[in-house]
Structure formats: structure tokens, C-alpha cells
Design a protein with these regions (language model features):
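N-terminal active-site segment of His-dependent metallophosphoesterases
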Residues: 1-68, 72, 170
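Divalent metal-coordination and catalytic microenvironments
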Residues: 8, 28, 48, 63, ...
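Residue-level detector of anion-binding/catalytic polar loops
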Residues: 41, 76, 103
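Short, surface-exposed connector motifs at secondary-structure boundaries
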Residues: 71-79
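Glycine-rich, charged/polar anion/phosphate-binding loops
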Residues: 209, 227-231, 239-242
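Residue-level detector of conserved catalytic or cofactor/ligand-binding positions
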Residues: 243-251
Length: 251
């Protein structure tokens, strides 16, 4: 099964007070052209769809246009909110969107549930995990000892056990320890928000957002795709990632 893994669109972003919306629409059009030329079975949007929790109306219209274009191509879309997004705003209309196979992570209320896809090899379960903070997880499991981002993610994934007979894809938006950050990302003091890559070991592919540089972390199938549009000089030369998952075993 083949997915296009995208993240960190940051729609509505301004760089030095210059609106990037025209450039963002251009890159989304290029992505649609890529999808027309290279068919995929689904699109993964790993958070930071917008640049701000309250995006400008033009950014909302641009995301609406992009999701509509994906839906008209009969492509299932799997989207989560990132740290720049308002989870409530991103999740608005999620039940209605699901009727068009546009699956959006709800506001965090517990362990994500699988969304199944079928192909000739069997079932692929997609799990949507929006950006997590420790307080969110403590609210759901108040008796758990959660002091850090790592504790929070570990708690959630203890309650989310993929079916070993299915291929599994997790879409998440966290900073994984050992990954390389770029200058345009929000700084973290002392890596306080980092999580251990080993926490994701139960999943065959982990589609990460948050960091703007495309990279793997540890294994080949734990990846940041990077941002499709560049927001700093340190991001020059980056490209999109096209992910192909074809077997029920980890690759």
C-alpha cells in the first residue's frame, strides 16, 4: 500500500510580514499534480495544518480547497492536529468529513482507534494521534504517573495495541529524541518535550510531523517527511517523501 506522507503545511504563515499563502497554494497544486502522476492509496497529514491556532480565513479556505481536491480524487485522507493548530478547530465537522473518507483526529480523549484500509495483502490499520501534552493525558488517566511528554506518550500507547496480523500506521506529531531540528521550529529548552523512539516499536510505519527536515529516526520506518514549503534557509533543498508500505511485516 502506498501513502503520501505530508506534514507542517503551516497554512497562513507570514515570513517577515510577507504572506506565504500564494506560495502555499502553488505547492499544494504541485502535490495534487504529483498525486495525479503517481497514484497512492491514501494521504497522511501529520499536523501543523495551520500556522496559528486561529488561522486567517484565507488559510481555512485553502485547506478546505485542498481537502476537497483530495476527496474528489477518491483518496482517503488521515489528518491530525499539531502544536500550532487548535485541535477543536481542526476537528470541527470531523464526523461529516469521514463520510468523504477524510478522517481527522478528534480532540484527544484517549487511545486512538484503528481506521482500516484493505488491499491485496490484507488490512492496514491507520491510527491518528494528535499532538500531546502531559496535561491532556493526565486528564484522561488521572491515576497514571505522568510527569513528562515521554510519560504521556508511553501511557497512551500502552492503551493502543495494534493487531499483529495487520499492518499498522501511526500518524503523530511529537519531537522524537535524536532527531535534527531546524531554525524555523519552536525551540525546546533541554529537550523537555522529547519522546523515546522505542515507544513506537509496535507500529510498522510512523508518519511524524513537527520537525521541518525530512529524516528517519532510528529505523527506516520512523520518519519525519519535513515541510513541503521552506520557511528558513536551513530547510533549502528538502523534498517531499513518498512512502510505500507493501508487506505486513515491518520494513
Amino acid at each position: 500500500m502506498r501513502f503520501l506522507h505530508l506534514s507542517d503545511l503551516h497554512l497562513g504563515k507570514r515570513v517577515c510580514e510577507f504572506s506565504m499563502l500564494e506560495d502555499q497554494r502553488y505547492i499544494l497544486e504541485e502535490i495534487l499534480t504529483l498525486l495525479d502522476e503517481t497514484p497512492v492509496d491514501g494521504v497522511l497529514l501529520a499536523g501543523d495544518l495551520y500556522d496559528k491556532p486561529v488561522p486567517p480565513a484565507e488559510a481555512v479556505r485553502l485547506l478546505d480547497w485542498f481537502l476537497t481536491q483530495l476527496a474528489t480524487r477518491k483518496l482517503p485522507v488521515f489528518a491530525i492536529s499539531g502544536n500550532h493548530d487548535s485541535a477543536d478547530r481542526v476537528a470541527f465537522g470531523a464526523a461529516l468529513l469521514a463520510d468523504s473518507r477524510v478522517y481527522v483526529s478528534p480532540v484527544f480523549t484517549g487511545a486512538p482507534q484503528p481506521i482500516p484500509l484493505q488491499d491485496a495483502h490484507g488490512t492496514v490499520d491507520v491510527y491518528l494521534l494528535p499532538f500531546l501534552k502531559p496535561a491532556m493525558v493526565r486528564h484522561v488517566w488521572p491515576d497514571e504517573p505522568i510527569e513528562s511528554y515521554n510519560d504521556a506518550l508511553a501511557c497512551v500507547l500502552r492503551h493502543c495495541t495494534p493487531d499483529p496480523g495487520h499492518r499498522s500506521v501511526l500518524v503523530a506529531h511529537q519531537f522524537v529524541a535524536g532527531a535534527a531540528a531546524c531554525e524555523s521550529e519552536e525551540p525546546s529548552v533541554g529537550g523537555v518535550d522529547s519522546v523515546d523512539a522505542a515507544l513506537f516499536d509496535a507500529f510498522d510505519y510512523v508518519a511524524l510531523g513537527h520537525l521541518h527536515s525530512p529524516q528517519k529516526v532510528g529505523r527506516e520506518t520512523l520518519r519525519y517527511c519535513g515541510t513541503p514549503l521552506k520557511y528558513s534557509f536551513s530547510e533549502a533543498g528538502q523534498c517531499l517523501s513518498l512512502i510505500h508500505i507493501s508487506e505486513p511485516t515491518r520494513r
